[in-house]
Amino acid sequence: MQFRSIIRIVGLLLALFSVTMLAPALVALLYRDGAGVPFVTTFFVLLFCGAMCWFPNRRHKHELKSRDGFLIVVLFWTVLGSAGSLPFLIADNPNISVTDAFFESFSALTTTGATVIVGLDELPKAILFYRQFLQWFGGMGIIVLAVAILPVLGIGGMQLYRAEIPGPVKDTKMTPRIAETAKALWYIYLSLTIACAVAFWLAGMTPFDAISHSFSTIAIGGFSTHDASMGYFDSYAINLITVVFLLISACNFTLHFAAFASGGVHPKYYWKDPEFRAFIFIQVLLFLVCFLLLLKHHSYTSPYDAFDQALFQTVSISTTAGFTTTGFADWPLFLPVLLLFSSFIGGCAGSTGGGMKVIRILLLTLQGARELKRLVHPRAVYTIKVGGSALPQRVVDAVWGFFSAYALVFVVCMLGLIATGMDELSAFSAVAATLNNLGPGLGEVALHFGDVNDKAKWVLIVSMLFGRLEIFTLLILLTPTFWRS
């Protein structure tokens, strides 16, 4: 294990992360809200700590192995998540505890969107901007992690995807170097953010709200600058724009890369991808169920309102954004539970969405269908085909391994919450909301996590990390084998 090289890289990451504090400091200066001091202070603290880690080890540039890569990825999220809590700790408004500061920071960076802060409308603009910007920064990190780094380490949804499944993604000549891949993804991510911000502004948002919500929309984070979330704007146009950009962001970013690289975006190009087709099918099915049941129960006086709310909440929850326009927990009980379960599927591999990813659910479904056929014809040989090509058994085994680990982590976290005194419904939905990086839950955590006890919040922080790091990245560090030389 190249510890000095790892410390050098972490120091460099801290120094680079310190620069992100300048943006909210400028917002504080622009709006004169008096909230700039926490960010300037944090900038110098992180820059100093980063330099202290980097400078003594600057000449240690040994070749890193996969074990070093796992540790660096985990340290990226834990160190930056911890560093991101400093402005919340230093700021007078909001005046929150150490636990709440860490919870808010990790929730933002992992794009979970669960918040402990109430009274968002009264907060300084700089703090509001920082929460949104932290989600956007985390979203970019997620894309680079999922598309460029985890496949190199041999894990993650994209590893299965790019290795075995035919279609546009496998045929795409993604740049081989991580730095070049990250640069290409950065341009796409930034372009989508600008387009989203302009669309929100044209639909009636203020420039501040438009930029802030474009950050959390493209990152599929779900943070808002208002307690009422997207319901604050009460606009069909804004709801529709949010839906469109959430769907785009929940798609595999290598599909976007392939589309841009080919010189034009064509629907047929996306439709060749089996995961994309499955994703759209799931979205349409969920929307129809929600819309028809809302009509049946007369939840809204107008069918247009029912259509708007069903579409928005379906996409928002199932892609794990967690934006709300209405108290969806007050819908007929079946619907919020259905949408909560849909977050277990989440977005596509290589997207900013959370959950287990559509590609894994697709492979699990095909595996289940194969087992049913085997019961009828025990001696027959069946292969799982995706996009016309048969998948080797090791791919199916990898998916089942992930599913088993996911279930284990879920149960352990849920039992941990119940042990702290949380009721069963709230514990189940809180773990679902954090492990799937969704945000809002049901019961005690339907609106916010401010009333959750401190011990439970630390369990949920760990749950967020497990969800964002696709279980195995963090789980492997807990095995004795990893630390043996």
Swiss-Prot record:
GO CC annotations, alphabetized: plasma membrane
Region of interest (Selectivity filter part 2), ranges: 219-224
Stretches in topological domain Cytoplasmic: 1-2, 58-65, 151-177
Positions of region (Selectivity filter part 3): 319-324
Domain of life: Bacteria
Sequence segments annotated as region (Selectivity filter part 1): 110-115
Keyword Thylakoid on entry: no
Binding site for K(+): 111-112, 220-221, 320-321, 437-438
InterPro entries, sorted: Cat_transpt, TrkH
Intramembrane runs of residues: 98-109, 110-115, 206, 207-218, 219-224, 235-250, 303-318, 319-324, 333-344, 345-357, 422-423, 424-434, 435-441, 454-465
UniProt GO MF annotations: identical protein binding; potassium channel activity; potassium ion binding; potassium:chloride symporter activity; protein homodimerization activity
GO BP annotations listed: potassium ion transmembrane transport
Keywords associated with the record: Cell inner membrane, Cell membrane, Ion channel, Ion transport, Membrane, Metal-binding, Potassium, Potassium transport, Transmembrane, Transmembrane helix, Transport
Membrane topology type: Multi-pass membrane protein
Transmembrane annotation, as ranges: 3-29, 36-57, 66-90, 125-150, 178-202, 276-296, 392-419
Annotated segments matching region Selectivity filter part 4: 436-441
Subunit structure: Homodimer.
Name of the protein described by the UniProt record: Trk system potassium uptake protein TrkH
Species whose genome carries this gene: Vibrio parahaemolyticus serotype O3:K6 (strain RIMD 2210633)
